[in-house]
Amino acid sequence: MILYKSEQRVLGRSDCLQILSQAEKDHPDAFERARDYFVAFVDPAAYYKPYPTVAEINAVNSAFTEWVLFDFDFAQATAAERAGEPLPEAPQTLVEAYAQGDATVEELARTQFFSTFWVIAQDPKRKLSVMRETRTCRDFEVSCDLISTRRNWTSGTVNARIASVGGRWVSCGRCLSHDSAPSEPQPACMTQTDPERESSRFIELVRELEGVNGRFVATARAESFWPA
């Protein structure tokens, strides 16, 4: 495990709430379109229950927050409001649009991705885990209190969003889920291949976990949290 001399700032709850609040104020129509798309695509099972639990509603809200911050193409959604202005060459997420020159947020927005990992090793004292991405077999040393302390997560796989902040990989998403189905880790790959960012990967998993017709909705034990 690597020791770091000082903590790097992580995009926290207050940062995210500030971005969401400002975006909704600046672009209410685009924000509403994002919400409508998310609800139509996921079709949350909680919305069909007469008395959903607070945890069920929080799970839906947490998933929407993570998706709209990190995966939703905000530039395309606001194109009509900026008639005559050229669109960015690549999709621009909400967190990228509102980084506002903050180097930490810009780095996080540029490097973040959501994927599936094997948890290879845990160090609870340092809140660090070695996580092997299942598609590239690349190892990441990730700072996350929750992942480092869940001993049973060394079996099966974990779905998480991570990003590099100041050269250190951190858990940056609001939603984590653990799949307990047996899965044997593949050998680590020595090449530093960057996992391909797929903006649909997160929302598709949310539909399976929380959607009314989701494959795992009956047995899902998803957790949502904000990094400290």
Where do the protein language model's features map onto the residues?
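Mixed-charge, low-complexity intrinsically disordered regions
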Residues: 1-123, 137, 146-228
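Extended, charged helical/alpha-beta scaffold domains that provide interaction surfaces
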Residues: 139-141
